[in-house]
């Protein structure tokens, strides 16, 4: 079964909000990956890059990690 994507071909709904949150907290992609690793999540800079550029789907664990790190709700992350 093929993986779902939006009518515009996007593979996730969080890329724009992830970029905005990362910039709001003055984090580079590498810095965000480092913070996530310190929190116990196995995400590197390449994962962040691929999510932000719509080249990758996002798992529920990754969404939880980002929500926890930025202290935002799931709904706020996918708006």
Regions found by a protein language model. Name each.
Residues 1-25:
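A short, Lys/Arg-rich alpha-helix, primarily the initiator
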Residues 18, 29, 45, 60-63:
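Helix-turn-helix DNA-binding elements, focusing on the entry/boundary residues of the two helices
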Residues 19, 23, 37-38, 53:
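Residue-level detection of the helix-turn-helix DNA-binding "recognition helix"
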